[in-house]
């Protein structure tokens, strides 16, 4: 009996931990530098995190080969219309945009940010603010860090 109760409790705790790790959190942009540090410290080369900018749009932070990147995926035809504004905003902030893909199907627009978390967060904030109207008080839906 005790073993069954213990097993049940452990199963519930494991389920809560699992689902909580997959649920988006609502925070402000001030949490980005800490998240960037966690991302850099993560040993999984496929780890990333992002936040919704509006409805289903999202910006993603990626740490690859010692560099931090800000990515914007053009995953459907309507999103392709945002490529030019993204490039223009990036250029206004002194960045060039490269293209890559996560799945060899959809284009991802990529900006290389500073390797210093606080600077990278500020650089990305400028882009997010100008392109999507985000400000420091905006509650953002952070996408779970994927590993």
Predicted segment positions?
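Hydrophobic membrane-insertion alpha-helices, especially the h-region
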Residues: 4-18
